[in-house]
């Protein structure tokens, strides 16, 4: 989490950086390094609910959510999120990147997103979507993608956060375990920016060991 904090300050020094955490174990190391920390309810169902609770204290008009497992986030990713939120009527925004390999496209741990012609999300799924009806039709196309890999960073309008946190989890969100589906189920538009490369996330201790920080 400290690596991510330092990285954000390095990449986007003009942005305010706050940390919304669910306990003192995470909060104190950040405070010790001079970062501003907000303690939130540990039983919230999603990261977006956590951001909503934190922003009720902060009162910011727009919020960008970078999770602590993204210590290699780049300036371009943050600015792309801001640009996606600027799309007309977008209440929420996120990032996507083309899949490099078919096995990644078929992996349920790598979330797929399909877009409309204007760059808004139609649906997110762990399943490989869309599914070809006819035998022999391409299921995956690396050259001309019809689905992208979702990158789990978000931007929000504050009014949307207030509404989102008051909504119960929908069926799709519970089935897929994807918090952004609550927004789509409620009719909100999610702007998506396609970026050139994915971030390098850290899910396991060995992932951190394999990273080279600059």
Where are these regions (language model features)?
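Hydrophobic/aromatic residues located in beta-strands of well-ordered beta-sheets
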Residues: 17-19, 63, 93, 121, ...
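Conserved core of the sugar-phosphate nucleotidyltransferase
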Residues: 75-169
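Short phosphate-binding loop-to-helix
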Residues: 12, 18, 22-80
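Short, well-formed alpha-helical segments that are part of the catalytic scaffolds
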Residues: 1-9
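Conserved alpha/beta core of the MobA/IspD/sugar-nucleotide pyrophosphorylase nucleotidyltransferase superfamily
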Residues: 138-214
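A general structural signal for well-ordered alpha-helical segments in protein cores
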Residues: 1, 27, 47-51, 78, ...
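Short, high-confidence coil segments that cap the C-terminus of an alpha-helix
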Residues: 14, 60, 88-91, 188
């Amino acid at each position: 989490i400290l690596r991510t904090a330092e990285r954000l300050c390095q990449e986007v020094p003009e942005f305010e950086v706050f940390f919304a955490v669910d306990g003192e174990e995470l909060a104190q190391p950040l405070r010790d390094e001079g970062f501003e920390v907000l303690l939130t309810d540990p039983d919230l169902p999603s990261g977006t609910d956590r951001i909503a609770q934190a922003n009720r204290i902060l009162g910011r008009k727009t919020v960008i959510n970078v999770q602590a497992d993204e210590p290699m986030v780049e300036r371009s990713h943050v600015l792309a999120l801001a640009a996606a939120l600027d799309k007309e009527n977008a209440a929420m925004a996120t990032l996507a990147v083309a899949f490099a390999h078919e096995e990644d496209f078929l992996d349920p741990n790598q979330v797929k997103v399909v877009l409309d012609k204007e760059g808004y999300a139609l649906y997110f799924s762990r399943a490989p979507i869309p599914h070809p009806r006819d035998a022999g039709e391409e299921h995956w196309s690396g050259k001309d993608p019809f689905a992208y890999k979702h990158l789990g960073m978000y931007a929000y309008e504050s009014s949307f956060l207030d509404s989102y946190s008051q909504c119960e989890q929908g069926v799709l969100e519970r089935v897929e375990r994807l918090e952004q589906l609550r927004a789509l189920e409620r009719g909100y538009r999610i702007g998506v920016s396609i970026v050139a490369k994915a971030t390098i996330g850290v899910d396991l201790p060995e992932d951190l060991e394999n990273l080279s920080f600059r």
